[in-house]
């Protein structure tokens, strides 16, 4: 369980109805929500993001089924697939560390607007373009200068910053393998955008939106911009009609 899972459930303000998670990954939040709320949970991920682990789909399915969820509660789709849910299906929609990986954000936000029930709330926890340290590689500024990503990864890894040692220990990576892996990952699978982009896009498609820092700084919204340089933030979207 991630430390922010309880915060996410608390921030939704409701604990029952239908909940959809976008980008469910290993299914950990689905399990947590199913076991710690009265939500009927569903999740999906895209097959293109399943990664290099060929057993991931089977492993996640077995984990969810063994915990009492239905196999149909977690589906895999292609990037080009339309979400197979009816209009107004969900009281709550959640994404965790997913938004920065979505290339066509307008399409996904439009689907959120379609899928939320009136009064429903979407909550996204993710790093914006303001963040100074790329959370995937752990390397400062690695995502800030697309034409210099390799050089930045190499420089900071040489100084001991980032996750190179973790990957060396866990996957037996050489430094060049680590650099090439994250150069490709940041170039092709990460699409960092600034906070105001998400706010403006949400409003454009008819969702009231705001953002805030993580608890316990929730009551200090004036710190959100500052906090966004150092950690992920929460983006809220509410469907009013």
Sequence positions of predicted segments:
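Conserved alpha-helix/loop element of class I SAM-dependent methyltransferases that forms part
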Residues: 1-16
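Class I SAM-dependent methyltransferase SAM/SAH-binding core
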Residues: 28, 32-81
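A structural alpha-helix within SAM-dependent methyltransferase catalytic domains
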Residues: 31-34, 109-113
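A short acidic, Gly/Pro-enriched loop at the edge of an enzyme's catalytic core
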Residues: 81-92
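Helix-to-beta-strand junctions that scaffold the AdoMet/dcAdoMet cofactor pocket
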Residues: 102-103, 116-118
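S-adenosyl-L-methionine-dependent methyltransferase catalytic module, highlighting the catalytic core
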Residues: 106-108, 121-241
């Amino acid at each position: 369980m991630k430390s922010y899972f309880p915060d996410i459930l608390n921030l939704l303000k409701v604990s029952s109805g239908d909940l959809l998670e976008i980008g469910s990954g290993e299914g950990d939040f689905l399990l947590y929500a199913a076991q710690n709320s009265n939500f009927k949970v569903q999740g999906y991920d895209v097959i293109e993001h399943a990664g290099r682990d060929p057993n991931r789909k089977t492993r996640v399915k077995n984990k969810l089924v063994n915990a009492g969820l239905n196999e149909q509660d977690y589906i895999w789709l292609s990037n080009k697939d339309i979400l197979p849910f009816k209009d107004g299906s969900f009281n709550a929609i959640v994404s965790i560390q997913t938004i920065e990986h979505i290339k066509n954000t307008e399409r996904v936000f439009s689907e959120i607007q379609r899928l939320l029930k009136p009064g429903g709330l979407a909550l996204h926890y993710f790093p914006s373009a303001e963040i100074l340290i790329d959370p995937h590689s752990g390397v400062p500024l690695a995502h800030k200068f697309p034409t210099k990503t390799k050089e930045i990864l190499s420089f900071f890894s040489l100084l001991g910053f980032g996750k190179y040692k973790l990957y060396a220990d866990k996957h037996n990576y050489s430094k060049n393998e680590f650099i090439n892996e994250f150069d490709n990952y940041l170039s092709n699978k990460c699409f960092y955008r600034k906070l105001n982009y998400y706010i403006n896009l949400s409003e454009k498609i008819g969702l009231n939106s705001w953002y805030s820092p993580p608890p316990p700084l929730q009551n200090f919204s004036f710190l959100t911009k500052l906090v966004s340089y150092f950690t992920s933030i929460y983006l809220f979207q509410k469907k009013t009609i």
